[in-house]
Amino acid sequence: MLSVMVSSSLVLIVFFLGASEEAKPATTTIKNTKPQCRPEDYATRLQDLRVTFHRVKPTLQREDDYSVWLDGTVVKGCWGCSVMDWLLRRYLEIVFPAGDHVYPGLKTELHSMRSTLESIYKDMRQCPLLGCGDKSVISRLSQEAERKSDNGTRKGLSELDTLFSRLEEYLHSRK
């Protein structure tokens, strides 16, 4: 039963995160600072993400006619680490860059959220918080997601608040 729930959640993620591969990959500027490795150290940046998202949420969700698919089971269980790593990379490399084309009037807000999320992701990668094992499942999900269109971008951006909640849950589960 658990494997069916996890499998169903992963398949749903693949659908809504699919976006155009024409988007440029994310670039991250690496600073010579030591990352914060405690989940509570991410609270301020997550709050900043939520505040920015709240300003643009009506626009992003206006065209989203799908139900919420990024449920809490996604980051729990044996694949949670790999799923969170894949989700964050997907948002930074594909969803946010494609969002610039889908929502040109929201470029400032999207760039702000992307920059903050990049900072969180970079710190997490330098900490043991995302030390994952086998990525073969995520690799298959990624290949499937690449076949989607702008609907994946719209869905991904409209559910940013859910992503932020799942990220927070994940960070707290790694204490």
Curated annotation (Swiss-Prot):
PROSITE patterns referenced in this protein's UniProt entry, alphabetically: INTERLEUKIN_10
Pfam families listed in its UniProt record: IL10 (PF00726)
UniProt-annotated location(s): Secreted
Any single biological process term in GO: symbiont-mediated suppression of host type I interferon-mediated signaling pathway
GO cellular component: extracellular space
Keywords assigned by UniProt, alphabetized: Cytokine, Disulfide bond, Evasion of host immunity by viral interleukin-like protein, Glycoprotein, Host-virus interaction, Inhibition of host innate immune response by virus, Inhibition of host interferon signaling pathway by virus, Interferon antiviral system evasion, Modulation of host dendritic cell activity by virus, Secreted, Signal, Viral immunoevasion
GO molecular function: cytokine activity
Positions annotated with a glycan in the UniProt record: 151
Top-level taxon of the source organism: Viruses
Disulfide bond annotation, renumbered to this chain: 37-127, 81-132
Signal peptide range in chain numbering: 1-19
Purpose of the protein: Functional viral IL-10 homolog. Can bind to the human IL-10 receptor and compete with human IL-10 for binding sites. Requires both subunits of the human IL-10 receptor complex to induce signal transduction events and biological activities. IL-10 signaling pathway has several immunosuppressive activities that are exploited by the virus. Inhibits TLR-induced type I interferon production in host plasmacytoid dendritic cells.
Subunit comment: Homodimer; disulfide-linked.
Similarity remark: Belongs to the IL-10 family.
Protein name as it appears in the record: Viral interleukin-10 homolog
Species of provenance: Human cytomegalovirus (strain AD169)
